[in-house]
Amino acid sequence: MQVTQLNLFPLKSAQAYSVQQVFVQAQGLSFDREFMITELDGTFVTARKDKILYQFSVLPIPQGIVLCYQQTQYVVRYVDFKQMQPCEVWGEVFLSYIADTQVNHWLSSIFQREVQLRWLGVESQRQLTAMAKPMSFADSNPILLCSQKSLHQIQQWAPVEVTMAQFRANIVIDGQTAFAEELWRVIQIGEVMFEFVQHCTRCVMITRDLQTHELNPHVEPFRTLKTHHTNARGKPIFGIHLIPQNSGIVRVGDRLQVIRSEEI
């Protein structure tokens, strides 16, 4: 088995930025979910509610990032983030940097309400108690791995076209058997050892059309997963969450080795 895709999501809930190699650190993949848009009170903005986020993409540059929206580009420098204020992701409150007024004014004009751009900073102030490690702006775990073999099985079940992009995986592998990854507990890819945290439970976000940005009227492929592939609590699952055990580089084409798995 080997890695076929590496995807970063520099801005939470926005478009993927695909790379051929990535540096893995304690908080996850470097440059993944290091930025997010929040309300004025620091509450995170998500594409579950604001589909406009799917129209944003981010390009890295040495001094910061380029925010791209439709035909507009806006250069945001790291030095533009000076003030730290509390922010919130799924009820967890921690400090992050706020972009300057000009950046936030531009974003607010797009969202048609006042919002802010946040940056984790060089060192994340967020730390999940269960992990005892720094964490990005990701929902609950730093890295998501999905298998193309598992996707193929979902495509066989679903009455609509389903793509890997809908599942927003960081690491995509070719796989050998559908859903075999759900039994892995420790794996190695390239220079990095990863430990299984939990299966990825899915929400209606996977039903959003990546071209029109509208939710599928038949709630697919969420409904298909709900019918065919759930955890013990009846929640649809696809992919596994991982935490890195060390730092190092992972590349497209790297071999995946299963170090330890759970017996059926």
PLM regions and their residue ranges:
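Metal-cofactor-dependent catalytic cores
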Residues: 1-264
